[in-house]
Amino acid sequence: MTARVKSRRGYDSPRRREQAAETRRKILGAAERLFCEHGYAATSMPAIAAQAGVALKTVYLAFGTKAGLLHALGDVRLSGDDQPIPVTDRPWYRQLLHGDDPQLLVRTAARQSRVTKERSGDVLRIIRQAAVTEPALAELWDRIETEFRAVLAGIAERLDALGSLAPGVDATSATDLLWTLNHPDTWYLLVRQCGWTADRYEQWVGETLSAQLLGV
């Protein structure tokens, strides 16, 4: 009897975890749609629960607060998954920092900028706007910007170590250029407001970085 109970619990546990993860994804997707359509302030937790098709209590149990929900949404959209792995520990970034081809490094950085912004650009815009009135989100935005610059500084330092930076460009100024060209605000202006395609944005970032950082 005891063995059967233990076996059933062991069998059900992964299933319950997957169900919980699926519910979490549904809530995040619903929140993203409503935040993008109506804005952070005008979106209520009951509206998110209704959009996700779950009980309001479920939303609060999963995320605590609306700010906590947006925080979780930002983390997932930035990383592309729900694994708590920093960018600096992700395989694509570690491989980037060990590359010896500066042109490939710059092109990969441009490609990754496109992929990340397509996934997270709108959510980052919402976080930045909400940070004006939400202290917890202001802290989140500061953390995002700090980590973002650190990631780009790693790329600049690698180019510097390869001796590939153009005359007059050091690691600090290279970081400034990477920061400006890859910033979510730049993506938003060009893609969302000016109507650029993702291909055009990626090409422009890559070509501009090559010209400004490598002098080619």
Task: Kindly give the residue locations of the regions a language model identified.
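Helix-turn-helix
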Residues: K26, A30, L34-G68, A72
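Amphipathic alpha-helical packing segments from all-alpha helical-bundle domains
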Residues: R114-R128, P135-L162, T172-D176, E207-L214
